[in-house]
Swiss-Prot record:
The lineage of its organism: Bacteria, Thermotogati, Deinococcota, Deinococci, Deinococcales. Signal peptide: none annotated. SUPFAM superfamilies: Periplasmic binding protein-like II, Porphobilinogen deaminase (hydroxymethylbilane synthase), C-terminal domain. InterPro entries: HemC (IPR000860), Porphobilin_deaminase_cofac_BS (IPR022419), Porphobilin_deaminase_N (IPR022417), Porphobilinogen_deaminase_C (IPR022418), Porphobilinogen_deaminase_C_sf (IPR036803). Binds 1 dipyrromethane group covalently. It holds the Pfam family Porphobil_deam. This is Porphobilinogen deaminase. Tetrapolymerization of the monopyrrole PBG into the hydroxymethylbilane pre-uroporphyrinogen in several discrete steps. One of its GO terms (molecular function) is hydroxymethylbilane synthase activity. The porphobilinogen subunits are added to the dipyrromethane group. GO terms for cellular component: cytoplasm.
Length: 309
């Protein structure tokens, strides 16, 4: 029996989504023994805020050590939250499979009487770690107090329960994958808050020359998700931005057409650029690149660069 070692971070969410991946792979490859190996990353150990890390321009914050293990052949497949992956893979590695995306939206969880983002009272304390969400909240609701909130899902929920925050915003996918969908009070519509590029999707990364493992991983690949993700990540790459930039993107496919909406905001909420591009789904990469070029002409680079200063 062949053994395939699957590497992941050790958080509750990372393990939940990796176990989901392994269960799907076992359905396709019942004669293969899949083993999970947890790996600590810089993101797990560093206590700085994501704003501080964005200023440093850190890339691969959540994935570098896992990719190093993959290159060293200590693991065969790496499972990542796709939104955490830089838009370029290290030499010798590739994204070989993107399973079907779950809900890509952001989710709000609030205390009693704090269940809708638009209805939060003036001065309400809202917690998030994301630079993108902070920029959005300061633009959309400048009357709110935006507070930093880091830690795993359980830590963030506990912080809400302690009374330190009136509401928090998390990725809906994380709550769904950890079987806590019932905690969500509001799925924030992308028309209001665009998710991070790739949010809600997973990536299976392998060594480029490992054809056997690539075949194993590709068995759970979802083409529609791949098309949407390609547009979103080409948009991010075209902006020269990374996963900690104040950038949102959301692609939708309908009747063979892919519509991509992009958003870039100033961290202090004083300026927002939002635009849409559409085309045949086969041109998904070009759609993302064209939208990035359009937004660069409108000053997006200055907003992204300001976060690093």
């Amino acid at each position: 029996m062949r053994t395939v070692t699957v590497g992941t971070r050790g958080s509750t969410l990372a393990l939940a989504q990796t176990r989901w991946v392994v269960a799907r792979l076992k359905e396709e490859w019942p004669e293969t023994d899949f083993r999970i190996q947890t790996i600590s990353t810089k993101g797990d150990r560093n206590r700085e805020s994501l704003e501080q890390l964005a200023q440093k321009g850190d890339k691969g914050f959540w994935v570098k050590e896992i990719e190093e293990a993959l290159l060293a052949k200590k693991i065969d497949i790496a499972v990542h939250s796709l939104k955490d992956l830089p838009t370029e893979q290290p030499e010798g590695l590739e994204i070989s499979s993107i399973p079907k995306r779950v809900d890509g939206r952001d989710a709000l969880i609030g205390r009693e009487g704090m269940k809708k983002l638009a209805e939060l009272p003036e001065g309400a304390r809202i917690g998030t770690s994301s630079v993108r969400r902070k920029a959005f909240l300061r633009a959309y609701r400048p009357d709110l107090i935006v507070k930093d909130l880091r830690g795993n899902i359980d830590t963030r929920l506990a912080a809400l329960g302690s009374g330190e925050y009136d509401a928090i915003i998390l990725a809906a996918a994380g709550l769904i994958r950890t079987e806590q969908r019932h905690r969500i009070d509001e799925f924030v519509d992308p028309d209001i808050l665009l998710p991070a590029p790739g949010q809600g999707a997973l990536a299976l990364e392998t060594r480029t020359e490992d054809d056997l493992t690539i075949e194993v991983a590709y068995a759970i690949h979802d083409h529609a998700t791949d098309d949407r993700i390609t547009a979103e990540r080409e948009f991010l790459a075209g902006l020269g931005a990374g996963c900690m930039a104040p950038v949102g993107a959301h692609a939708v496919i309908k009747n063979g057409l892919l519509t991509l909406e992009g958003w870039v905001g100033a961290l202090d909420g004083t300026q927002v650029i939002r635009a849409t591009s559409q085309g045949d789904v086969a041109e998904c990469a070009d759609i993302g690149a064209e939208l990035a070029a359009d937004m660069l002409e409108r000053g997006a680079a200055e907003l992204i660069e300001a976060v690093r200063e």
